[in-house]
Amino acid sequence: MNDWHEFNAAIKSIYCNAEGDSSSIINRLVGLAMKSEDSTFIEAVLVLKENVSKVDKQLRFLWLTSTINSRFYPPIPISEASPVSWNKTEYCAPGTEELQRRYPGRAKLQNEEDYSGGIEQCRDVPDCSLVASLINLRSKNLNLPLIKQISSTKYHVNLSFNGSNKRLVTVDISQIPTSVDGKQLSLKSNDISDKIGELALLLVSKGTYSTDGSNISIDTYRLSGFLPEITQVNSYPFEKLWKFHKSNLCLMGAGTGNRSNDMIKPLVENHDYSIIDITYDSRLVKLRDPRNSALNVEISYEQYLKNFKQLYLNWNQEKLFKRSQVLHFRYDTSRYNKFSIVADKPLFHLVNNSKVTETVWLLLESHLQDEGSQENRSVSFLNEAPECIICPIEPPVECGGNHIGLQLVKLRLDAETERLLYCYSTTNNNFSIHSFSVVKEICFQRLKDTKSLFAKVLFSFPYEIEGKASFDTCNFFQNPTFELEVHSEQDYQVLMDAACISTSSHDLINIQVYYFNDYELIKPIMFDNHYQPGQGLKQDVPILTNVKYMIVCSTYGPPASTEFELLASIRLSSSWRLISGITLRSVNLIYGTYPYHCRNRFHWKETSDKLKIQMTLPTKKYSTNKLFIRVVPVESSARLRMRCNIFEPESALCVYECQEYRTCPSGGIVIPDLEVSRTNIVVLMIERSVPISSCLPTEGQLDELELFVGSSQKIRIEKYSDDVIPK
């Protein structure tokens, strides 16, 4: 068997290592095969040599997620598995001191060929759902799970978990806890394969006989791969249930849950039962209690509705569908759960390319993790993305599997339509999504290229802003500002959504959208004066592709968080496939787009309504300098009105003229892209329309303003005459 042990080590190394040349490993196995007289070993080496070049990321992912509680369960069909074990221990421990005391011995699993009853649960093993699952499988003459004996005491079993229906589990039947009178911790059955199936699933689930319990849908899926559906007992009318049962397309069970004491006898609470028959004329549901093979309970459909909480269905996907595929991925909460919105989650694209409506089923499977992990406390689900994908996530209305790690989603897609779906989990875990369809025209894939759907940027608020910077203040223009442009080959009008999100719900957030050249922030598109806790959301904003826009994010008070995210997305109904990309980037437009910046504060004299500021330009002859000038009062006031003019002091020639007084907008008064040439000094004259003495007491000091100048070349701001007192 040494050759087989080396074969196992080699195949694990090849499939689990992304890098490295495997040729030396293969050559060594080929050398062993040439010396071997075991035809099975020789064939296994040849198959491995042929398939080693076909190893892709998805298959490697399956191998890398094979370890649970220090045991390795590779994705290998039993027909291709080596006849040796992958793990040192392959039997279950009792689990509790009480079970250890009552079952002190260890003996080989008893083969009860003379037992005449049906499959029956051992009262000391709380696995009624597992036994009920085996009862259902045998009632339909299904020899599942697949089992192969490899020695006198060891068996290979293929179970369905962690993304594969061919997980190889080896069980050792020589170490079964046994009482002094010969009773064993094992179900009763005249077929030892039922006992082996139970042992294999107990080994994988917890490794002991002291289980936490499960349900029929989960255990039937693990044993057979049949698709689990968990729903309320009243989800389907009686006629539907009868059709399901007669179709032989599914296995059925029901759970009482934590019911009240008025439950009819002999039903008990927190117990699963197999549904073994449904009579149409009498509307009777026949149940089998896994604890007693002689006890079949017949109840009316009305009693079924009253006494049971959940209906369990497991669908035979091989009878329902012709095509299937599976995607595997890792969910990292530090990456996907920082902000609770759809766009930040793993996205999946489902397309029906056929000419008719098609049915597609998706199964979201959470991978089993080590004992003590957060798996049992996890919530995970797959859901259709809303039109606005930057909205907060919402669990599906009907999601029976979001707490148990197996969620079945049934969809009907119209001809030549598509759906966008997202996955959410409260904990770190590996996931697999299985898709099933009848026709090959169904395409399901991970949406990794999201540039035509949304763009996002992380940012923090600058600390240099003094005081409030909400849109009703003169500091509003200093908030984080972003350039947005949606690109397409042709020009379209599309609906855009934008969201600014904080990691703190204490932040009150607002976002405004402007045309990019609206430096004074005069005309917001669809102005919204609300500040929302934790997330500012702006929806259905009509914009044109290939046109630049500006987004300004603000908080009502000092930000509580240092981490914010801005997202802009196109509505799914806005032909987002015609979009070639979305650009969203941080920009500083306080000084326009120029590289040189000057900033200073100035006071008006109490006796004057004019303020003159001298700007000294480079003395280089014939040079042209471009200026971006922003004039902002330090205190906001609706009563303060100003006008700005620029002239050459020597010639008194007006370089920029404004005759009307204006109320100062949110972005201040801006003179953009002013070209100055053939002179090295210009004077900015700022005039106000009311004297300071007439301001209201609540308005504070209106005698101070701030000047921001961007320029293509260096300039210097200094006082002109005696009107200016730099501060």
Curated annotation (Swiss-Prot):
MF (Gene Ontology): calcium-dependent cysteine-type endopeptidase activity; cysteine-type endopeptidase activity
Single GO biological process annotation from the record: protein processing
Biological function: Required for the proteolytic cleavage of the transcriptional repressor RIM101 in response to alkaline ambient pH, which is necessary for sporulation and invasive growth. Probably the protease that cleaves RIM101.
Domain Calpain catalytic intervals: 70-317
Family: Belongs to the peptidase C2 family. PalB/RIM13 subfamily.
Main EC class the enzyme belongs to: hydrolase
Miscellaneous note of the record: Present with 432 molecules/cell in log phase SD medium.
Protein name per its UniProtKB record: Calpain-like protease 1
Stretches of the chain forming a coiled coil according to its record: none
Annotated InterPro entries: PalB/RIM13_Calpain-like, Papain-like_cys_pep_sf, Peptidase_C2_calpain_cat
Enzyme Commission designation: 3.4.22.-
PANTHER family: CALPAIN-7 (PTHR46143:SF1)
Subunit structure: Interacts with SNF7, which may act together with RIM20 as a scaffold to recruit RIM13 to its substrate RIM101.
Keywords: Hydrolase, Protease, Thiol protease
Taxonomic superkingdom: Eukaryota
Active site as annotated: 128, 271, 296
Keyword Protease attached: yes
